[in-house]
Amino acid sequence: MLTPQRSSYTLQFVTKIGKDDLLAEALLCEKTNFTINSVYLGKMICMTVHAVTMTKFTPDKAERAAHYNPQEHIYETCPGDEFYDACEYSLVGGGKLSTSHGRLSPTKTTPHPKSAGVTPPQRVPARPATRAAAPSATPTQPDCVAKQRTSPGVNSIKSGKSLAFSCTPKTPKTPWYGATHLFNKNVFCAAVSRVAAAHASDAASALWDLDPPKTNEDLDRFLKAAAIRILVCEGSKLLEMANATMERSPDGAAAVAPIGYDRRPRLASRRRSIKCKPPADDFFDDTDSR
C-alpha cells in the first residue's frame, strides 16, 4: 500500500483483465501524468487511465481534488512481455471507469467541466520509445509458417517400402481422377531411377574391369573415354525389378564387396584373366594353384 504524501493523490482500484481481478494501486504526484503501475501474472503494466476521480490527501482530511480525462491509454511492457487489454476499471468507493481500447498514442490531458477551476497537472515530455516499441533490426519470423504438402506417393517412396501403383480405380477402363495421375507418375519415376541406377552400376563395373587404371594419368584418360548408355526396358516387370534392386541395395546401386574388389564371372569379362589376376586371398580365386 502506497503511503499518500502531502499534496499528492492516491487511488486504489480493482481492474478486471480477462477472468482475473487485479487489485492495483497508483500514486499521482503534482505536475505529473496520472499513471497506474500494476503487476499481472508477473508482467509489469504501465497504463494511463481514461477517466478517474481522485481524492487528495492532506494531514487533516481527504477531499475530492480533480477529475482528469485523458483521451487515450498507454501500454508499455518490457521485451517479451504480453500486452493485456484491461476490460474494466472499478473504483473501490463505487463507479466504473471505461477504457478506450484504442491505438497507442501519447496521452492528452483535458480538465473535466465540473473541475474547471482546478488546475490539472502539467504534461511531462513523452518518454522515449521502449525496446518493445522500437523497430527491431532483425527480421521477425512469422508465428505460423505454411507447411507445404508433399507430392502424392513421395512419402511412400521415401519410406523404402515396395513400390506399387495406385489401387484406384478398381476397374481397368475407369478413368483416373484426383491425385492418381501424379501418384502413378512419381512411382514410375522412382522405379525407373532404381532400375537405371542398378544397370549403371553394373555397366560401370564391367567398363572398369576391361582395363582398370593403375595411375592418376590412367584414371584421367579412362574418365575422358568412358561412355555408358543405360536402357531400361523391363516392361510390365518394372516394379518387380525395382523392388528387387531395392532389396539388394537400399540406395538402388549394385552391391559391392566390403573389401572393394568385385570379381565378375569369367564369361562376363571381355579381357584375359592374365591382365587382371585376383588377389591370392580372394575367395573367388579359381585359378589353378598347382
UniProtKB/Swiss-Prot annotation:
Interacts with gE (via C-terminus); this interaction is necessary for the recruitment of VP22 to the Golgi and its packaging into virions. Interacts with gM (via C-terminus). Interacts with VP16; this interaction allows the formation of a tripartite complex composed of VP16, VP22 and UL41/VHS. Interacts with the capsid-binding protein UL16. Interacts with host CGAS. Residues 98-156 are annotated as: Disordered. Tegument protein that plays different roles during the time course of infection. Participates in both the accumulation of viral mRNAs and viral protein translation at late time of infection. Modulates the RNase activity of the virion host shutoff protein UL41 probably to ensure necessary levels of key cellular mRNAs and proteins. Plays a role in microtubule reorganization that occurs after viral infection by stabilizing microtubule network. InterPro entries: Herpes_UL49. This is Tegument protein VP22. Its main location: virion. Highly phosphorylated in the host cell. Packaging is selective for underphosphorylated forms. Residues 98-112 have a biased composition (Polar residues). Residues 118-142 have a biased composition (Low complexity). Keywords: Host cytoplasm, Host Golgi apparatus, Host nucleus, Phosphoprotein, Virion, Virion tegument. Belongs to the alphaherpesvirinae VP22 tegument protein family. It is found in: Virion tegument; Host cytoplasm; Host nucleus; Host Golgi apparatus. The keyword Ribonucleoprotein does not apply. A motif (Nuclear export signal) lies at residues 219-231. It comes from Equine herpesvirus 4 (strain 1942). GO terms for cellular component: host cell Golgi apparatus; host cell nucleus; viral tegument. A motif (Nuclear localization signal) lies at residues 146-149.
